[in-house]
A protein has these predicted regions:
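Short amphipathic alpha-helical segment within the helicase RecA-like ATPase core
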Residues: 1-221
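Short acidic (Asp/Glu) and glycine-rich catalytic loops that position anionic groups and cofactors
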Residues: 228
Length: 228
């Protein structure tokens, strides 16, 4: 499906190029669309000069007040199939809008008897969204891990998931076991690990690409925690 997206403020200017003015005005009035902040109106293809489905998105009086990521999620929630999107007027915060559109497509149906876990394939005409896709895939990977119950998320399974993720990426993964943790005084990790019959591990991922700066990211993956 091809979808055009047109952003309009509350003055409703800038649509003449894409619609017959009289028909457009009548349609907006019928559906009480006034270009207010976060208003979204779906306009049928028969009204558009491009003959595509068009989402008219309201920006209100002052677009400085708009959270463009949240606006993207509102737009994305209206899309329920694969779609090729064209922005008729590009905003300076288009990347945030794209992120919102993509992230809201997430589904986690792994434990449903009828699996409908396929994610809508969204592409963007005339825009390079490759970085947005990489971020989306990373976010979805993390969400899948979070949503997977501890019973199916052992440390060993987590290690396998990490290795699958970084395969062919140039990232070297080193895995250190409980004995290594004991020898290197990782008391905190070992202390938390005592709450489970599954032994803890310590993972190191090294990306040794040439770069001006070296960055270390440190985090913990507590796969099961009852709180305290």
């Amino acid at each position: 499906m091809k979808i055009d997206i047109l952003f309009l403020n509350d003055e409703m200017n800038g649509h003449d190029e894409y619609f017959d003015n009289d028909l457009f005005q009548e349609y907006c009035e019928t559906h009480s669309f006034e270009g207010k902040k976060n208003q979204i109106l779906s306009v049928p293809p028969s009204y558009s000069k491009s003959e595509n489905l068009t989402f008219i998105v309201g920006l209100g009086e002052n677009k400085e007040d708009i959270n463009f990521y949240d606006l993207g999620t509102l737009i994305g929630s209206k899309i329920n199939s694969d779609a090729e999107i064209k922005f008729l007027n590009v905003m300076e915060d288009t990347n945030l809008i794209i992120d919102g559109i993509l992230y809201v497509q997430y589904k986690f149906n792994n434990y449903k008897s009828e699996d409908d876990s396929s994610v809508n394939n969204i592409t963007f005409q005339d825009l390079d969204s490759s970085e947005n896709e990489i971020k989306k895939n990373s976010v979805f990977w993390v969400r899948d891990l979070i949503n997977t119950p501890a019973l199916d998320k052992s440390p060993e399974e987590f290690i396998n998931k990490v290795r699958e993720l970084v395969d062919s990426s140039g990232i070297e993964v080193e895995v250190y076991d409980q004995k290594w943790l004991e020898e290197n005084d990782f008391g905190g990790v070992l202390g938390v690990g005592k709450g489970s019959d599954r032994p803890p591990y310590f993972l190191v991922g090294k990306y040794n690409s040439k770069a001006k700066y070296q960055v270390s990211l440190i985090g913990k993956g507590v796969l099961f925690d009852t709180g305290g």
